[in-house]
Amino acid sequence: MHEARLYERHEEYEKRGDCAGAEGSADDSCGSDSYSKSSGSVVCRLCSHGCVIKSGGYGICGLRYNKDGVLYAENYGRVAVEAVDPIEKKPLYHFMPGTRVYSLGGVGCNFRCRHCQNWEISQCTAADSLHGLSPQKAVFNAVEHRCGSIAFTYNEPALWHEFAVDIGTLAHEEGLKTIYVTNGYLTEDAVFDLKGIIDAFRVDIKAFDDGFYRKVCGGRLQPVLDSTAAAKDCGMHIEVVNLIIPTLNDSESEIRELCEWVCTNIGENTPIHFTRFHPDYELTSLPATPLGTLEKAYSIAKDAGLRYPYLGNVAGHAGSDTFCPECGTLLIKRDGYRQSGVGLVKDGSVDKCVNCGEVIPIVR
């Protein structure tokens, strides 16, 4: 087991940052900073549930374990999924477009989303049944497969916080970038602990309604907004995904509120992806999202001042393409996960519209 990061002691109000084990040792444990300790119980400070965990108990994620007043991450280095993906699959459209990403996923989640498409791993906590992977091997695999980045994805990467920090540090030494595909339910302290380690924060804002979060996901909205704003403050590239579910989060007023919040707090150049819901897990009785609903969301985003809205899970639709927000020229044509930069020109390190010269914000 690997000791969790980030904690303060309630009783002594002391910070501890020492390593309990040497790097590469059998237990590979390191001083933690993400939980508070009091009378044998600990308060996990990694995600916004703030679980109070008694000795011998687990947090809501089922993976962070209190052993004699010390919090451990049982899933450190335990991998369920490894894959080489096109980066557009995340989806990320303004971050290293056209490149390959080495994707890693584990088990567990701090949400209980009724519509989860990866529920087989997200609602599983059997980390001991998975294969082990060291940070060094993960980075080696990414380089070996000619990937430009490593993504923590498929399940909630916050539960892999310590593993992600160790991989991210090594990845940067090899010139690789790093990606968090997250539900955003981290504490702001946890986000700031990722500063300089995570390059792209691809966040799901599942609805702009706290009731939805409580009933459908088992969480709250405000912590997601706070962590997303914190990621911006840390200089991370941000792209937002909103999966639109018929009857649950598809009202025009709610979509407008979401777009206005993103535009005001994250910025008008923030890509936002409205994706089509397909019935899954516990919501198989609902229909797929009508195309018209997605197209309306696209228009609402434009009207709210967002310059780069996209549609997802709708193959062949122009809503997945990138257009110049100034002159409307087609800049990047996408066909599934394949893309071609048909209307971009390079001006030094900057991408510009071939027609009007507008600077297009893309991280290469």
Say what each PLM segment does.
Residues 143-170, 212-225, 242-257, 263:
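Conserved glycine-rich "GG(E/T)P / GGGxP" loop and the immediately following alpha-helix
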Residues 1-52, 247-364:
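Auxiliary Fe-S-binding modules of radical SAM enzymes
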Residues 46, 60-63, 108-111, 115, ...:
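Short, cysteine/histidine-rich loop/knuckle motifs that typically chelate Zn2+
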Residues 137-140, 162-173, 189, 193-196, ...:
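Alpha-helical scaffolding segments of alpha/beta enzyme cores, especially the outer helices
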Residues 66-200:
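Conserved Radical SAM active-site core
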Residues 102, 150, 178-180, 201-203, ...:
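Hydrophobic faces of well-ordered beta-strands that scaffold small-molecule active sites
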Residues 122-123, 157-159, 185-191, 201-217, ...:
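Conserved radical SAM core fold
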Residues 53-57, 70, 115, 122-123, ...:
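Short, non-ligating residues that shape and space the ligands of small metal-coordination modules
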